[in-house]
Amino acid sequence: VIRPLIVLVLLFTAVIEPARAATDAKALLISIRKRMESSGKYTAELRLKVDIPFMKAPEAKATLAFTPPNSTKITSKGFAMIPKQSTELSALSLLSGEFAAIDMGTENFKGLTLRKIKIIPADESGNIVVATLFVDESAMLTRKVTATAKSGGTVAAELVYDNVKAASYCLPSYMKISMEVPNFEIPRTITGDFNESSQPKKPVDPNGKTKASVEIWYEKYRFGY
């Protein structure tokens, strides 16, 4: 009698634990979303440095304006190459609608043990099909994000939080976006002209992809303006 009871307990545990992990993972992400939503209206000054083969782009400046619940506008008076991934990879953007969360365990990143959570947005009209958030549970901050777009391309972002006030709303002071894009078809929003790089051109990837990165510094946050 005891042995069958033990088997039933083990089976029940095997079923309930993954469900509990998924629930806890989603609850964690919802907590982060609520912190970001509590920021209210804000602006920030941006510095952008773009590294794309075959193109030489000067460091640019822009202004970011956020209006609840999830409207982000980036403008620049001069030259600006602003990848749309800079807003798509925001935790608030990824978590703004309904989503499924899958607990993928933990992963070490720059000396930190991060909770790895895969999310699948319920809204199929968005550009992001699936994303993985690497969460620092002790600080309740997303340190890294990887995402797959409808085009099949993979994008990754690393985030730093040096501004204490901004970090309290899970907003970064620095973000580095790395991606692969089709050769000669760099996705961008441009104001002004750009110059072809004077550096020797790198060999074209046989898979038809070009590696690119964008560094963004977020400065002079203004909340509740």
Language-model features: locations:
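Sec-dependent N-terminal signal peptides
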Residues: 4-13
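Sec/Tat signal peptide C-region and signal peptidase I cleavage site
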Residues: 16-21
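Flexible, processing/modification-adjacent segments and terminal tails
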Residues: 22-41, 45-51, 55-58, 65-141, ...
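Gly/Pro-enriched, hydrophobic low-complexity segments
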Residues: 113-225
